[in-house]
């Protein structure tokens, strides 16, 4: 993808919590991802890569800056990038490029255009670098969903109404974040196709909640599980076992946990993490969200 001025256009697409082994190029043959498969066949496929940090914001900071998290700033979530580090948009430093950021930021104030990007499309309302600087505007995704007739289902840290991840997963496919970002990416590319551009697209899917509009696409019982399915690792700390037991006790509206919100949500989705069948369904729904990502990639590329 190059502009008429022969400077390469850069399109960086990032999904959230997508395992490497969900792609055909890494041996997966049961998830329907034709666009990603075709892209991989015409690409360099990395077979020996390691994330700098397993936590969301620190890992994102490394991808965005090329630095280790302790240098970029975010060593845990909810810490913004340091002001003196450069993002990919600032590193390019070419006035002929139009730099666009679309999607989940998670490195500071999500709804504010910043860090060298000329265009900014936000998707989350409740990640602020500081809650002492006043209320930030709603995200572009929030306003888009409102215009489509949807209603917020929860509240952010400051009490304003928001679309929660759980509530958004109940919406139809054409109202999912991946579909929203597809639309915005197509518009960005169409408007900037005569000049060089760098476009960074960061979607939320297939991040939990694993349910979504394509639930039922895959038969839970027909998907391979492997020998470690539902097997706890050996020689781990007791705190890790306790955390696993806690999250595995959420079931369809049961009283095993006092977390009424989580139980009601899981009951509404028909999910049950206390049984083998429940975990199989969650895996199938997760894989369906990867197909949703694949459809987004197809529209962009």
How would you label these PLM feature ranges?
Residues 1-301:
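Formylglycine-dependent sulfatase
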């Amino acid at each position: 993808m190059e502009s008429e001025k022969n400077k390469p256009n850069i399109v960086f697409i990032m999904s959230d919590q997508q395992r490497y082994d969900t792609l055909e190029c890494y041996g997966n043959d049961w998830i329907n991802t034709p666009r990603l498969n075709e892209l991989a066949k015409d690409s360099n496929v990395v077979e020996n890569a390691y994330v700098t940090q397993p936590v969301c914001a620190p890992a994102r900071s490394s991808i965005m800056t090329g630095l280790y998290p302790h240098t970029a700033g975010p060593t845990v979530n909810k810490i913004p990038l340091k002001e003196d580090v450069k993002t990919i948009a600032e590193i390019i430093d070419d006035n002929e490029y139009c730099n666009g950021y679309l999607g989940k930021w998670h490195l500071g104030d999500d709804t504010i255009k910043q860090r060298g990007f000329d265009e900014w499309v936000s998707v989350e309302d409740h990640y602020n670098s500081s809650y002492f600087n006043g209320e930030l505007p709603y995200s572009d995704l929030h306003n888009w969903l409102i215009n489509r007739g949807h209603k917020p289902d929860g509240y952010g840290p400051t009490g304003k109404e928001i679309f929660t991840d759980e509530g958004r997963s109940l919406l139809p496919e054409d109202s999912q974040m991946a579909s929203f970002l597809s639309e915005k990416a197509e518009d960005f590319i169409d408007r900037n196709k005569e000049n060089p551009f760098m476009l960074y697209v960061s979607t939320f899917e297939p991040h939990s909640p694993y349910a979504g509009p394509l639930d039922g696409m895959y038969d839970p019982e027909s998907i391979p599980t492997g020998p470690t399915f539902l097997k706890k690792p050996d020689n781990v700390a007791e705190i890790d076992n306790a955390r696993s037991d806690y999250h595995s006790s959420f079931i369809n509206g049961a009283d095993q946990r006092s977390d009424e919100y989580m139980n009601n949500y899981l009951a509404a989705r028909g999910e049950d993490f206390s049984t083998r069948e429940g975990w199989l369904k969650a895996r199938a729904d997760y894989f369906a969200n990867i197909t949703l990502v694949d459809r987004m990639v197809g529209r962009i590329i």
